[in-house]
From Swiss-Prot:
<keyword id="KW-0812">Transmembrane</keyword>
<keyword id="KW-1133">Transmembrane helix</keyword>
<comment type="function">
    <text>May play a role in bone development.</text>
</comment>
<feature type="transmembrane region" description="Helical">
    <location>
        <begin position="40"/>
        <end position="60"/>
    </location>
</feature>
<protein>
    <recommendedName>
        <fullName>Transmembrane protein 263-A</fullName>
    </recommendedName>
</protein>
<feature type="region of interest" description="Disordered">
    <location>
        <begin position="1"/>
        <end position="33"/>
    </location>
</feature>
<feature type="transmembrane region" description="Helical">
    <location>
        <begin position="78"/>
        <end position="98"/>
    </location>
</feature>
<dbReference type="GO" id="GO:0016020">
    <property type="term" value="C:membrane"/>
</dbReference>
<comment type="similarity">
    <text>Belongs to the TMEM263 family.</text>
</comment>
<keyword id="KW-0472">Membrane</keyword>
<dbReference type="Pfam" id="PF15475">
    <property type="entry name" value="UPF0444"/>
</dbReference>
<dbReference type="InterPro" id="IPR028153">
    <property type="entry name" value="UPF0444"/>
</dbReference>
Length: 114
């Protein structure tokens, strides 16, 4: 064997750029959307709505269609809400958000002189 001959060894599959055939045949990978990129993968999707929780604050975006009497085509409308400590429910294409709102009401304070 001369020094000019090179022996090529097979490259392991994990060093190749493309995955080996058959590993992703039934489960194609989905590209991350904008919500996934913004929240770092912490998101949940329901029918007709997208929601995310960041630091205890729930972000909910609902998508619905409104049809008016004068328009024949449907006009898409997007609703977005930020709710802290809430319970959200989505049914069909209607996004509903319910929360317990605690308003800060300052009462009349008495002075020490009274």
């Amino acid at each position: 064997m001369s020094q000019t001959e090179k022996i090529e060894e097979p490259v392991p599959s994990y060093l190749c750029e493309e995955p080996p055939e058959g590993t992703v045949k039934d489960h194609p990978q989905q590209q991350p959307g904008m919500i996934s990129r913004v929240t770092g993968g912490i998101f949940s999707m329901t029918k007709g709505a997208v929601g995310a929780t960041i630091g205890g604050v729930a972000w909910i975006g609902g998508k619905s269609f409104e049809v008016t009497k004068t328009a024949v085509t449907s006009v898409p409308s997007i609703g977005v809400g930020i709710v802290k400590g809430s319970v959200s429910a989505v049914t069909g294409s209607v996004a509903a958000v319910g929360s317990a709102v605690s308003s800060k009401v300052s009462g009349k304070k008495k002075d020490k002189s009274d």
